[in-house]
From Swiss-Prot:
Name of this chain's protein: Putative pterin-4-alpha-carbinolamine dehydratase
Organism: Hahella chejuensis (strain KCTC 2396)
Enzyme class name: lyase
GO BP: any one term: tetrahydrobiopterin biosynthetic process
InterPro entries, sorted: PCD_sf, Pterin-4-alpha-carb_dehyd, Pterin_deHydtase
Length: 112
C-alpha cells in the first residue's frame, strides 16, 4: 500500500477490493483500527477519544476536509469526547487500498 493517495480510485465501479490475502498486512499498518462487517460489507473503523466536544468536532472537520480533497468520504459519528470514523468504498461495497490510506491520514491528523 502506498502512502500516496490518488483521487478516489475506489469510487470507480471496476475498482478492485483488497485481496483477502493482503488484508492482515493492511490492518497491521493501522493497528488501532478494527475490521467490521455490516450487511456483508467489510469496513474498518476506529474510535478516537477527546477531552471535550469542541476537540471532537474539530477533528471531525479535519477528517471531513481530507475526505473532500480526495472525494472519498467516511462515516463520521461525533459525540462528546469521541469520534468514530468508519471507512469503506461504497461503490464496490467493501474495502479498497484507499480506505487504509485514508485511515493513515486520520492517524496523522489525530497525532498532529
Amino acid at each position: 500500500m502506498s502512502d500516496t493517495i490518488p483521487s478516489c480510485e475506489a469510487c470507480r465501479p471496476d475498482a478492485e477490493k483488497v485481496d483477502p490475502a493482503k488484508l492482515e498486512k493492511y490492518l497491521s499498518q493501522v493497528p488501532e483500527w478494527r475490521l467490521e462487517e455490516r450487511n456483508g460489507v467489510q469496513m474498518i473503523s476506529r474510535d478516537y477519544k477527546f477531552k471535550n466536544f469542541a476537540l471532537a468536532l474539530e477533528f471531525t472537520n479535519k477528517v471531513g476536509a481530507i475526505a473532500e480533497e480526495i472525494n472519498h468520504h467516511p462515516e463520521l459519528v461525533t459525540e462528546w469526547g469521541k469520534v468514530r470514523v468508519t471507512w469503506w468504498s461504497h461503490t464496490i461495497k467493501g474495502l479498497h487500498e484507499l480506505d487504509f490510506a485514508m485511515a493513515k491520514r486520520c492517524e496523522a491528523v489525530f497525532n498532529a
